[in-house]
Amino acid sequence: MRDLRGNARYVLPTPIPVTLKTGVQWREILVQQLQLGGSRRWTYVGTGARPTDPGLTMFDEIKTGRRTPQWEATMFIRDRTLINPTLWSEDVFYREQQKYTGTKEVTETVSAAFVMAEGKLGRQGLFARTGYLTGVRIEGTANESWGWVRQRFGSTAAEQQADPVRAAARDYANTRRNLKGGYTKSFPSTHLTHDFTSSLRGRLAWSTSFGRPGMSNWLPNESVNEANQTITVNNPDLLPQTATNWDATLDYYFEPVGNLSVGWFHKTIKDYIVSGVNTGMIGSGNDNGYNGVYDGFTRLTTSNAGTAVVQGWEFSYQQQFTFLPGLLKGLSGSANYTAIETHGNFGGNINSETSKVVGFIPRAANMSLSWRYKRFSTRLLYNYTGSYIVEYSAAAVGFNRYRMPLKTINLGLAYMVRPAVNITCDISNLTNAPQVWYRGFTERMQSTIINGIAVSFGVNGRF
């Protein structure tokens, strides 16, 4: 990555101070993958079963009682070399194929500039208690990529076995794709603050924001379904998801050392990124973008296909309980809760509700309780993350992927040996809560990850 940037700041000599700031940035990210030696794999051709590793216990055995034989790769290969080559036959076609599919490159270049102003509306009275921050960022992004894809009618298994090097070249050598894309966008924003009293502050903001698509979207990729006459490709012209945001917050500060905050937010997201979008039929002729093949096929791709609206509330509270008697005065606590409702339209006349809009967690909460006494301190943290959708496809709604609710408890302990040295003990996921994903409905579990309970000890020092 290469990054160049410069900023300038100037305070206007006016009765009401105004600070101006401007800046420019140029950034280039190059991601290159080379598989010159190729990835390799082998097939066992021996006549007898190989010894298994009895020390491996799998989740399936714990849940069902079945004992499935398990092997570790280090039992058969060391330093990328087979321990006993006579027992294995290499898939040479796979190795040669990976030299093409594993070699690719993508470059993203961003050129941007911004200007902003900050100050107060007045010097005295009501306007002196009102501040502002406003500005705009203009950004241009260009991307280029190249890579190999498989030709429509690949080599047969017999051809791959007889001459794997030539078969791989036949499948890939003449189907290198070079893609380009880009966009230019501006992102203005305005933020206001007002102190109603010494302990009550209000905030109001209108802003625009964006989220760039992943760079993998710009790499050449073609997945062909001959039965359905479709080809799924990447889209190098994907725009960023943009959002117009309204945020309003009230903060109340109280003694001893406490804060209560209530916030409301509303976001309108445009150019929402959706996969499996039908972008039309591929034409005929050598200039159809696919060397003259796939005419009549339906092109499916990832596209900026609609809008989403997100709004909700945030509540937070934190306080030190120094007014309590005795040992309890070392207590402090905090809590926050977020509730989100979403809906979106990704093409057609059907609006999708919260359960179908990717990237948002409808319900989330955190609570913590801390206690400090002399050199000893401890903290208990509870985290709740509600169920949410992870993957959405307009072409296969029944296979949308969701994550189940997750509740975790973490405990932290610390002892101050001296002001510059602390000993710590942190226990994560105290209840060993698993992460569970499912497809379509909760009974169709896709995967479960048991993270386990992690205990870590540390020494922190300042010298």
Task: State each model region's role.
Residues 11-20, 35, 122-132, 199, ...:
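Short loop/turn motifs that connect adjacent beta-strands in outer-membrane beta-barrel proteins
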Residues 44, 331, 384-393, 414-463:
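C-terminal beta-signal and adjacent terminal beta-strands/loops
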Residues 1, 43-101, 160-175, 278-303:
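Flexible glycine-rich, low-complexity coil/linker segments exposed to the extracellular/periplasmic environment
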Residues 24-32, 121, 137-144, 206-212, ...:
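Transmembrane beta-strands of outer-membrane beta-barrel pores
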Residues 18-24, 128-136, 202-204, 260-262, ...:
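Transmembrane beta-strands of outer-membrane beta-barrel proteins
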Residues 266-269, 273-278, 285-392, 431:
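Gram-negative outer-membrane beta-barrel transporters
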Residues 102-109, 181, 210-269, 292-320, ...:
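Outer-membrane beta-barrel signature, preferentially recognizing the C-terminal barrel domain
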Residues 30-32, 82, 100-104, 162-163, ...:
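Surface-exposed extracellular loop regions of Gram-negative outer-membrane beta-barrel proteins
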